[in-house]
Amino acid sequence: MKLQRFTLLIAAVLLFTCAVVAQELEPSAAKLQQHVTYLASDELDGRRTGTAGANEAAKYIAKEFERLGLRPAPATDSRKINVMSARYLQTFPYIGSVELGKNNVLSVQSGETLNFRAGEDWMPLGISTNKKLDLTEVVFAGYGITANELNHNDYKGTYTKNQVAVIQKGTPDGDNPHGRFTTAGQLRFKVAAAQSAGVGALLIISSEDDLKNDALARLSYDNAGLAGIPVAVISKQTAEKLANAKQITLATDVVRADVPAHNVIGVIEGSDPVLKNEYIVIGAHYDHLGRGGEGSLAPRSGEIHHGADDNASGTAGVLELARIFNTQRQKLKRTLVFIAFGGEEEGLLGSNYYVNHPLVPLDKTVAMINMDMIGRMKDRKLVIGGVGTAQEWRQLITQANMSLKTTIAANSGSAAPKGVPIVVSANGRPIMTVDPNGAFELTMNEDGYGPSDHSSFYSKQIPVLFFWTGTHSDYHKPSDTFDKINYNDEARILSLVARIVRDVDSADPRLTFTTAKSAPPRGGGFRVYLGTIPNYADSNDGLLIDGVRDDSPAAKAGLKAGDKIVKIGNREVKNVYDYTAALGDMKAGQEYVIEVLRGGEKLTLKIVPQARN
């Protein structure tokens, strides 16, 4: 009996300690709502990277860091932080301004010379390579789709650089978003198919009666590399006049310019004279999709995509954790680095830039905590990724989650509950109780890679965690609004994150990095899997690989992080879309030659794709 009482006493003391920490690390649902309401407001116009709305969001975050007393990250002589309205901004390159140049020409000879007006009869696309061509033949190639996995090829026969392919917009499936040709019918894959076929240029017939109403004719650039050939959209009337053309002169002149894009970085310095030189990164992306377009699940609406859950919720989480830890800076041993990333929706551009231009040493970065879509919790279910990237993660997460069951009730007048550990005051009233439903139902995934910013850090062998409450019907749509966020549960998620950060901060020694077990390959629209982690930044000379999944075909072939793929089989690879098109050509179990650049040297490797589950 005495042993049982002693055990309960020890348990109570431990739980009380957790409860005291919980009280110190208590996030505010009201403050979260304040941040999300502004970030997801119409005023910021969807926060598309490179736009005024995204820049206003960056200013807001920077001002919050400044108001809280966080200091800017240290800038080096070679990599200064560019200033917009605060010292907290790290600027990275982003092409956001696209305009017509002065030398756009489309003319045909068919008995008479016909000159077509750029902007009215035709429009070069933002991804078009600038070039002047004298073409001798027009070939009509259906929808311009090559999909070997579907036994479909609109390019039959042999083609030359003197030919221009004219294709229809869309796919044989019509507007069905779940059709067989959804992937192969995307613009970039049509461009890759035309380039692979060998034609000199690609013209796409508009589906609109007036070219000005066609979204494809609106100059934009996706920051994923140039097409490699001239590409343009033409009106239906222009297409009819090309039918009997004997000679075509095509010159494309698109002016692309960088616009400011930013990561926002604030620092709370640790108090330990030695450990303050180690860093814990807490991050979330603040950009979204603007008014739709690339990445939107309602691309034609033209409405503001508010991005409340994706990812104003995670950004608000960064700001609230910065507030909490700033009040306890004297208790911190290590230095906390808070980063709001730009360019995530465009392909992890901001986080990828940071890990290649770090403002604190990567080898001293002990962990990265990423929050992406943490505002729509249901039934207390929470997904945590990256658990396999450090030996200690699973135990730390489990302990922190259990501590959520503890509640301080210093002013409670209720009787002590029976059968649970308690701590009582001098008058016998409970000052700490246990809430058996306080913890989350966790799904813990091992993999450190994934479609968010933690992936960039894991590729540099840094332990990562990724917090996510799951997708929903408003994902990437205008309807992802601030009023649908569950602020109370988000505050509890941040309580869990804060506990984990506190434990990582106090750990001695630091976390032990491990290579995580990769998730099994699934879906993706292709029958094969290689296991590479592509870098989605702008590229015209090959596809850079950020990482290789363990025990994958890429790993077995000898590919390494930092390799640049320039050719797969007979297909040249200049960017991620060429690479994806190459995947569509491949068959599981068949050996292919893959050429890569490594340290300036070209290597030829052999790879055998694996079938997807």
Q: What are the roles of these predicted feature ranges?
A:
Residues 27-52, 68-74, 86-89, 213-223, ...:
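N-terminal capping segment at the start of a domain
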Residues 34, 45-172, 176, 254, ...:
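Noncatalytic luminal/extracellular "stalk/propeptide" segments of secretory-pathway proteins
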Residues 231, 323, 327, 473-519:
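His/Asp/Glu-rich mid-to-C-terminal helical/loop segments that flank catalytic regions of hydrolases
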Residues 185, 189, 260-263, 290, ...:
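Acidic/histidine-rich catalytic neighborhood of metal-dependent amide-processing enzymes
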Residues 24, 97-101, 117, 121-157, ...:
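Soluble metallo-hydrolase cores and metallopeptidase-like ectodomains found primarily
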Residues 442, 477-479, 496, 505-613:
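C-terminal recognition in membrane/secretory proteostasis and scaffolding
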Residues 7-19:
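Bacterial N-terminal signal peptides
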Residues 115-117, 231, 239-240, 341-470, ...:
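Metal-dependent peptidase/peptidase-like ectodomains
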